[in-house]
Swiss-Prot record:
The gene is ruvA. Residues 1-63 are annotated as: Domain I. Gene3D superfamilies: 5' to 3' exonuclease, C-terminal subdomain, DNA helicase RuvA subunit, C-terminal domain, Nucleic acid-binding proteins. It comes from the Bacteria. The RuvA-RuvB-RuvC complex processes Holliday junction (HJ) DNA during genetic recombination and DNA repair, while the RuvA-RuvB complex plays an important role in the rescue of blocked DNA replication forks via replication fork reversal (RFR). RuvA specifically binds to HJ cruciform DNA, conferring on it an open structure. The RuvB hexamer acts as an ATP-dependent pump, pulling dsDNA into and through the RuvAB complex. HJ branch migration allows RuvC to scan DNA until it finds its consensus sequence, where it cleaves and resolves the cruciform DNA. Keywords: Cytoplasm, DNA damage, DNA recombination, DNA repair, DNA-binding. It comes from Helicobacter pylori (strain ATCC 700392 / 26695) (Campylobacter pylori). NCBIfam families: ruvA (TIGR00084). Residues 139-183 are annotated as: Domain III. InterPro entries: DNA_helicase_Holl-junc_RuvA_I (IPR013849), Hlx-hairpin-Hlx_DNA-bd_motif (IPR003583), NA-bd_OB-fold (IPR012340), RuvA (IPR000085), RuvA_2-like (IPR010994), RuvA_C (IPR011114), RuvA_C_sf (IPR036267). This is Holliday junction branch migration complex subunit RuvA. The keyword Nucleotide-binding does not apply.
């Protein structure tokens, strides 16, 4: 599994960059925001999410871990694929998107190409509680994703996350949350 690439940017287009890594050129899907920050001929370091489908092997690249975490969470929403998730990240920074979800600005979300009222409402409902307002937010979001991947519902996870001690490591938080969820 590819989780990161460090190499020279060969080509940049709106939603894809080509990165040469020791003689191999990788096509990586990126948001327009990420593409705008990269320069052809310059070295780049991207965090990668590799998605393997029946008909395609896709690499999605991110400059920031927060973008990658948000992208992974968006992919878990029924009706949101890589194209729409990248459109969201192209339109809003993770902080802007968090604000849109927190203030329930459905109309702003509908401005993203490919998102209608129904999907915007679904995204709002599915992401309520995903963005936790504290200094441990990135760790909490990782715990949320881990528990969700184990099949727990968002509402259950949010209840348990509220009870966890704030300075737990990710591993300790997952362990404690699992104990609470299974009891």
């Amino acid at each position: 599994m590819i989780v990161g690439l460090i190499g020279v940017v060969e080509k940049i287009s709106a939603l894809e960059v080509h990165i040469e890594v020791q003689g191999v050129v990788y096509g990586v899907q990126v948001s327009m925001r990420t593409a705008a920050l990269l320069e052809a001929g310059q070295k780049a370091r991207l965090k990668i999410l590799q998605v393997i489908k029946e008909d395609a092997h896709l690499l999605y690249g991110f400059l920031e871990e927060g973008e990658k975490i948000l992208f992974e969470r968006l992919l878990k929403i029924n009706g949101v694929g890589g194209r729409i998730a990248l459109a969201i990240l192209s339109s809003f920074s993770p902080n802007e998107f968090e604000s849109i979800i927190a203030t329930k600005e459905v109309k702003r979300l509908q401005q993203v190409p490919g998102i209608g009222k129904k999907l915007a409402d679904k995204i709002m409902v599915d992401l309520i509680g995903f963005f936790i307002q504290d200094e441990n937010r990135p760790a909490r979001n990782e715990v949320f994703l881990a528990l969700e991947s184990l099949g727990f519902k968002s509402a259950e996870i949010n209840q348990v996350l509220k009870t966890l001690k704030p300075n737990l490591s990710i591993e300790a938080a997952i362990k404690e949350a699992l104990q609470q969820l299974r009891s």
